[in-house]
Curated annotation (Swiss-Prot):
InterPro entries: Class_I_gatase-like (IPR029062), GATASE (IPR017926), GMP_synth_C (IPR001674), GMP_synth_GATase (IPR004739), GMP_synthase (IPR022955), GMPS_ATP_PPase_dom (IPR025777), NAD/GMP_synthase (IPR022310), Rossmann-like_a/b/a_fold (IPR014729). Catalyzes the synthesis of GMP from XMP. The active site is at 85 (nucleophile), 179, 181. Residues 206-398 form the GMPS ATP-PPase domain. The keyword Iron does not apply. This is GMP synthase [glutamine-hydrolyzing]. GO terms for cellular component: cytosol. Homodimer. Signal peptide: none annotated. It comes from Haemophilus influenzae (strain PittEE). It catalyses: XMP + L-glutamine + ATP + H2O = GMP + L-glutamate + AMP + diphosphate + 2 H(+). Pfam families: GATase (PF00117), GMP_synt_C (PF00958), NAD_synthase (PF02540).
C-alpha cells in the first residue's frame, strides 16, 4: 500500500488569514501537510519528521518585542524552510538579519523583479521586460527586511521593497515577502511546487485514490470486527464517511438517518434511495418530525431553536444506539478545519478557539470510541473523495445547508405548515436556478419563510398570505459575500411560480444584502 504520509510538509501558523490556503495548495500539489501553531516544541517537530517547513504570514509585527518567533530547531533540522511574508521576516531576524517598519506599506498587486538564480523561482516569470524576468504577486505587509542574514542573497525586488525575496541556497532557506498561496499571485502554485517537490524532494502521493485506500486500511485496523454507528444526514461529510466505512467493514456499519422534519423537499426519500437502494448500506430511518416540532413549539429565538434541535438530535440518536447492543464505535464527519479551530494553542494567537459541533460535543452517556476518517482532510478534498467513491456530482456540489435545517430558515416559531410551504417554494427556486444555469454560478441560494402576512389578489378575491424571501450569494470563503445579480426575468419566473403553485404564499421578495453587514443566513 502507498505510504501517503511518508513525505510531509509542516506549516507553522503565525496567525495569517491565508495560512489554511497554504496547506490547501500543498495538498493540491499532491503532498501531505499539517498546520501547527508556531509555538511547537523541538520534540514535536522531531516526532513529526517533516520533509520541509513553511513559515506562514501573520498580522503581528516582527519589530514588536514579544512578537512570535519560529522554534530555533526549525533552522537546525536540516530540512528546507520557506518563509512567507511574516515568515520571511522572522527567518531574517532569527538568522541575524534586520527588519524595520516600512514607510511604504504594500497591499495588493505588485510586480517583483527576479534577481540572481534560485531554485525557488526556477522556470517562473510572468513577463520579460528588457530581458528582466518579473512575477505578478500579491503583497500584504507593513514591515520589510532591510538587512540580509549571512550567506543570503536577494532574489526579488520591488521599487518600495528592495528585499522582496531572499535565499540561502546552501542551507535551502527561502523567503518571499509576497503570498504565493493566493490566486492573485499568478505563478504561486508553481512556486510552491518548486519548493515542495523540487527542493524538498516530496513525492506527490496525496491523491484521492491513495487517500481512500489509506482510510479504508486504517478503519479496518482501528475497529477490526467491531460494529460502528454513524449519524448519516445526507450531507457531503457524513456521506463520504458512510461510504468509506461501508467499503472497510460492510454490514458492521449501522447508519442512522434522523428525519427531523426540517429537511428539503423529498430529501429523506432521496437519502434512503441513494444509500439504502443504490449503495446497499445498512441504514435505519427514524421519523422524528413530531418530536422535533413538539420541542420547538412556541420557541422563536434563533439560538434557542438551534440548541433544541441539537439536543433532540442527540436524544433521538442515543435512543437508536441503545437498540444496537454490539456497537463499540461512533463514526463522525469531523474534517481538518474543525480540528484546526479546536486545537488549543498555548498562546491563542494561532487560531480562533471555539467549540465546534463535531469536536468534543459528544454526550457523556455515549461511551463509544471515535472513528473520524476525514479528520486530515479539507472540504475540497472530501468532495474529490466523494466523487471517486461514486457519489453524484450534483450531490457533492450542492450548496451548503445549515445543520438545524429549515429550523433557521423559518423565521420565528417553527410549525409544520410553515416548513411545508417553505420546502415547496425553495424547491421551485432551486429548480429554476438549475434550469437557467445560475445554480453553479452562485455559492449558496435558498428561500426564507417570513412570518408576516401580506395582501394579495387571486382572481376576484383578496387574500392575506405569507411572504417568501429568496436569497442568493456569491462568495469565495463565506466570510464575505455579495448578493447575486440574478436576471429579472429569472426572478420574475420564480416569483410567479411560487405564488401560483404554493397555496399560502402571496408575495416573494429578493434579499439584496451583502455580508457584511448582513449574514448569509437570516437566523
Amino acid at each position: 500500500m502507498t505510504n501517503i504520509h511518508n513525505h510531509k510538509i509542516l506549516i507553522l501558523d503565525f496567525g495569517s488569514q491565508y495560512t489554511q490556503l497554504i496547506a490547501r495548495r500543498v495538498r493540491e500539489i499532491g503532498v501531505y501537510c499539517e498546520l501547527w501553531a508556531w509555538d511547537v516544541t523541538e520534540e514535536q517537530i522531531r516526532e513529526f519528521a517533516p520533509t520541509g517547513i513553511i513559515l506562514s504570514g501573520s498580522p503581528e509585527s516582527t519589530t514588536e518585542e514579544n512578537s512570535p518567533r519560529a522554534p530555533e530547531y526549525v533552522f537546525n533540522a536540516g530540512v528546507p524552510v520557506l518563509g512567507v511574508c511574516y515568515g520571511m521576516q522572522t527567518m531574517a531576524m532569527q538568522l541575524g538579519g534586520l527588519t524595520e517598519t516600512s514607510d511604504h506599506r504594500e497591499f495588493g498587486y505588485a510586480s517583483v523583479s527576479l534577481e540572481n538564480s534560485t531554485a525557488l523561482f526556477a522556470n517562473l516569470n510572468d513577463n520579460l521586460t528588457a530581458s528582466e524576468p518579473k512575477l505578478d504577486v500579491w503583497m500584504s505587509h507593513g514591515d520589510k527586511v532591510t538587512r540580509l542574514p549571512q550567506n543570503f542573497q536577494v532574489t526579488g525586488t520591488t521599487p518600495t521593497c528592495p528585499i522582496a525575496a531572499m535565499s540561502d541556497e546552501s542551507r535551502r532557506f527561502y523567503g518571499v515577502q509576497f503570498h504565493p498561496e493566493v490566486t492573485h499571485t499568478k505563478k504561486g502554485l508553481e512556486l510552491l511546487t518548486n519548493f515542495v517537490v523540487n527542493i524538498c524532494g516530496c513525492e506527490t502521493k496525496w491523491t484521492a485514490e491513495n487517500i481512500i485506500e489509506d482510510a479504508v486500511a486504517r478503519i479496518k485496523e482501528q475497529v477490526g470486527d467491531d460494529e460502528v454507528i454513524l449519524g448519516l444526514s445526507g450531507g457531503v461529510d457524513s456521506s463520504v464517511v458512510a461510504l468509506l466505512l461501508h467499503r472497510a467493514i460492510g454490514k458492521n456499519l449501522h447508519c442512522v438517518f434522523v428525519d427531523n422534519g426540517l429537511l428539503r423537499l423529498h430529501e429523506g426519500d432521496q437519502v434512503m434511495e441513494m444509500f439504502g437502494d443504490k449503495f446497499g448500506l445498512n441504514i435505519t430511518r427514524v421519523d422524528a418530525e413530531s418530536r422535533f416540532l413538539g420541542e420547538l413549539a412556541g420557541v422563536s429565538d434563533p439560538e434557542a431553536k438551534r440548541k433544541i434541535i441539537g439536543k433532540v438530535f442527540v436524544d433521538v440518536f442515543d435512543d437508536e444506539s441503545k437498540k444496537l447492543t454490539n456497537v463499540k464505535w461512533l463514526a463522525q464527519g469531523t474534517i481538518y478545519p474543525d480540528v484546526i479551530e479546536s486545537a488549543a494553542s498555548k498562546t491563542g494567537k494561532a487560531h480562533v478557539i471555539k467549540s465546534h459541533h463535531n469536536v468534543g460535543g459528544l454526550p457523556d452517556y455515549m461511551k463509544l470510541g471515535l472513528v473520524e476518517p476525514l479528520r486530515e482532510l479539507f472540504k475540497d478534498e472530501v468532495r474529490k473523495i466523494g466523487l471517486a467513491l461514486g457519489l453524484p456530482a450534483e450531490m457533492i456540489n450542492r450548496h451548503p445547508f445549515p445543520g438545524p435545517g429549515l429550523g433557521v430558515r423559518v423565521l420565528g416559531e417553527v410549525k409544520k405548515e410553515y416548513c411545508d410551504l417553505l420546502r415547496r417554494a425553495d424547491a421551485i427556486f432551486i429548480e429554476e436556478l438549475r434550469n437557467s444555469g445560475w445554480y453553479e454560478k452562485t455559492s449558496q441560494a435558498f428561500s426564507v419563510f417570513l412570518p408576516v402576512k401580506s395582501v394579495g389578489v387571486m382572481g376576484d378575491g383578496r387574500k392575506y398570505d405569507w411572504v417568501i424571501s429568496l436569497r442568493a450569494v456569491e462568495t469565495i470563503d463565506f466570510m464575505t459575500a455579495h448578493w447575486a445579480h440574478l436576471p429579472y426575468d429569472l426572478l420574475g419566473k420564480v416569483s410567479n411560480r411560487i405564488i401560483n403553485e404554493v397555496n399560502g404564499i402571496s408575495r416573494v421578495v429578493y434579499d439584496i444584502s451583502g455580508k457584511p453587514p448582513a449574514t448569509i443566513e437570516w437566523e
